Amino acid sequence: MDLCVTIKGVSFLLQAGLGILANALVLLAYAHIRLAEARLQPVDAILCHLALVDLLLLLTRGVPQTMTVFGMRNLLDDTGCKVVIYTYRIARALSVCITCMLSVFQAVTVAPAAGPLLSGVKARLPQLLAPTFAALWFINMAVCIAAPFFSVAPRNGTVPPFTLNLGFCHVDFHDNLSYVLNGVAVSVRDFAFVGAMLASSGFILLLLHRHRRQVRAVRRSQGSTMETRAARTVLMLVILYSVFFGIDNVIWIYMLTVAQVPPVVADMRVFFSSCYASLSPFLIISSNRKLKARMVCATSEQERQAEDGKNSSGKN
């Protein structure tokens, strides 16, 4: 196997494998917390949903891409391509939407209650989570409904113009107008959510700066400490998303200017567009004491059960 192909395959394999494992661990840890405490905090519920969406994204894009790089062909038929591409498009859209939702939610949470309106919104935030999740799923399922109509299994021969060659599937837009309109629509949606995300994150950053200046004059409570820690986690997630979003869109804008996209360019975009989904769970785990405590607890429990099993076997 060619060295470049090997490096590319190993990169995709590590990205998909570690990302899937980390997102699954986050989901399992939050499931354990939900069973133990009977409820999740609003920020935890959003992070749990983000891990679910990122897991779907890696399963529908990272895994097929890795298998294709290692030479596996004819993975999916037309129906399989339609299902996988549609699910991927929804997961990708939800990833930016939920990250934006997390940033806006945290901005409202840390904002000082300046009046009855904001106080009322703050009080209702936990009740608004479920309807917001449902609305985001419904809207993105409707917006991405055109994706299956352009998705087909790869055909023998050359790739037609205005076609995104994903390796395991082709997304054939047939003409330049459909190709450009799709690209512009996706970019406008993403930039709108990223703009809201950056605006709310800037507001959080301003509040944290003010808090740091006033911290010697104001007694710090446990609640404010937890809010500050959560706000910093949100800021790090937004920065992480913005970096890879920028790289992704630079490549995407280039792809819109050419009728035939070189495979190496398409592979680069796939890799960078999946980096957030694979790295964000590590950031969530490293900055969330509750998650780390649950994982340590689960590991200790497994070790204790294994030790008890060995002792029982020795007695027998």
From Swiss-Prot:
PROSITE patterns named in the record: G_PROTEIN_RECEP_F1_2
One CC-aspect GO term: plasma membrane
Predominant subcellular localization, coarse grouping: membrane
Residues on Extracellular side: 1-8, 61-97, 154-187, 255-264
Tissues expressed in: Highly expressed in the olfactory rosette where it localizes to a subset of olfactory sensory neurons, mainly in the apical region of the neuroepithelium. Not detected in other tissues tested.
Bilayer disposition of the protein: Multi-pass membrane protein
Alphabetical list of Pfam families matching this protein: V1R (PF03402)
Glycan-modified residues: 156, 176
InterPro entries: GPCR_Rhodpsn_7TM, Vmron_rcpt_1
Name of the protein this chain belongs to: Olfactory receptor class A-like protein 1
